[in-house]
C-alpha cells in the first residue's frame, strides 16, 4: 500500500473535500487559472475535443473540469443491441455478480447489497453483470446512459471519501461500498438497471440532470428519493450526471439480458459510447 493510500485512513476526508469544493467554484482569476494550468500540465488534459478549447475561457475550475465535448467527439456504437460505455476512463473491473458479490481487486470484493444500500434492490442483479469505470483527472467527466431508462429512485448512501485510484482499489477493503455514493435506479425494457456514482477524496459533488448538484453531506442517514410517476426518461447515450472532480461509476445489469463485449477487461482504456455489452435478443 502506498503512503498516500495509507494516509487516506487518517486524513479529514470531509474537510479536504469541502476545501476542494470552495476552490473548484472560486471565480478568482488567479486561483482558477492556477488550478486549471496545474491539472492540465500534471495529467495531460487534452482540450482539443472540448466545446471550449481555450483554458482561460472557463469561469471556474469546476466549469473546466465538467467541460462539454464538441458535437460528434463521441458517437454511440451503431449496433442497436449495444449497451454503451457510460463514460471515458478505464475499466477497473467487470464481470458477473456471483453470489451477490462484486469483484474489486485480487482478494477484494463487496456485496451488491452493500453497494446499493439495500438488499432488496440488489436481489434483481444477483448473477447479473457489473462494470466499474474509473474516471481519471484528465478524462471527460460527464456520465451518460448505457441504455434508455426511466428514473425510478435515487439513493444517497453516506460514507467515507477514500481515493479511488488504482492503489486504493487494490488495498482498501470494500472501497466502493464504503465511499459515499449516489445510486440511480432505472426501469428499462429489459428490467432494472443501476448506475452508481461513487464519490472520492476531493470530489466536490455529483450533479444530475434531473436534480442538480448533490453535495456530500455529514451524517450517516441513507436518503431515498422516489421519482416514479415523474416521467423522467433518459435516452440511450444521453447525459445523466457529471462528477465535479474525478471518480468512479459502476453499472449493474440483471442476469440473462446482455453479454459483455469480448474486447474489454481490467485496465482497458474506454471511451464513452463504445459497446459495453450486447443485448441477448430473441
Swiss-Prot record:
Similarity comment: Belongs to the phosphatidylserine decarboxylase family. PSD-B subfamily. Prokaryotic type I sub-subfamily.
Name of this chain's protein: Phosphatidylserine decarboxylase proenzyme
Coiled coil region boundaries: none
Pfam family, one: PS_Dcarbxylase
Organism whose genome encodes this protein: Xanthomonas oryzae pv. oryzae (strain KACC10331 / KXO85)
MF terms in GO: phosphatidylserine decarboxylase activity
Lineage: Bacteria, Pseudomonadati, Pseudomonadota, Gammaproteobacteria, Lysobacterales
Active site residues of this protein: 88 (charge relay system), 144 (charge relay system), 247 (charge relay system), 247 (schiff-base intermediate with substrate)
Marked site positions, Cleavage (non-hydrolytic): 246-247
Places the protein is found: Cell membrane
Amino acid at each position: 500500500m502506498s503512503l498516500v493510500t495509507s494516509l487516506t485512513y487518517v486524513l479529514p476526508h470531509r474537510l479536504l473535500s469541502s476545501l476542494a469544493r470552495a476552490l473548484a467554484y472560486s471565480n478568482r482569476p488567479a486561483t482558477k487559472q492556477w488550478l486549471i494550468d496545474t491539472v492540465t500540465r500534471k495529467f495531460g488534459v487534452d482540450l482539443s475535443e472540448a466545446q471550449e478549447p481555450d483554458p482561460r475561457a472557463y469561469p471556474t475550475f469546476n466549469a473546466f473540469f465538467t467541460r462539454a465535448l464538441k458535437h460528434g467527439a463521441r458517437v454511440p456504437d451503431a449496433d442497436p443491441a449495444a449497451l454503451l460505455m457510460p463514460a471515458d476512463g478505464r475499466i477497473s473491473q467487470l464481470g458477473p455478480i456471483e453470489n451477490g458479490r462484486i469483484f474489486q481487486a485480487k482478494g477484494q470484493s463487496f456485496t451488491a447489497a452493500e453497494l446499493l444500500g439495500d438488499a432488496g434492490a440488489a436481489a434483481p442483479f444477483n448473477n447479473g453483470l457489473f462494470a466499474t469505470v474509473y474516471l481519471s483527472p484528465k478524462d471527460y467527466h460527464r456520465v451518460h446512459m448505457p441504455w434508455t431508462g426511466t428514473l425510478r429512485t435515487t439513493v444517497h448512501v453516506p460514507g467515507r471519501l477514500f481515493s479511488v485510484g488504482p492503489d486504493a482499489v487494490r488495498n482498501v477493503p470494500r472501497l466502493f461500498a464504503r465511499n459515499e455514493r449516489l445510486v440511480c435506479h432505472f426501469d428499462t425494457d429489459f428490467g432494472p438497471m443501476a448506475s452508481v456514482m461513487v464519490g472520492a477524496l476531493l470530489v466536490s459533488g455529483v450533479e444530475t440532470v434531473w436534480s442538480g448538484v448533490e453535495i456530500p453531506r455529514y451524517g450517516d442517514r441513507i436518503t431515498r428519493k422516489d421519482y416514479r410517476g415523474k416521467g423522467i426518461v433518459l435516452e440511450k447515450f444521453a447525459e445523466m450526471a457529471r462528477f465535479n472532480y474525478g471518480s468512479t461509476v459502476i453499472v449493474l445489469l440483471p442476469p440473462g439480458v446482455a453479454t459483455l463485449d469480448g474486447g474489454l477487461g481490467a485496465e482497458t482504456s474506454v471511451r464513452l459510447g463504445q459497446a459495453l455489452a450486447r443485448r441477448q435478443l430473441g
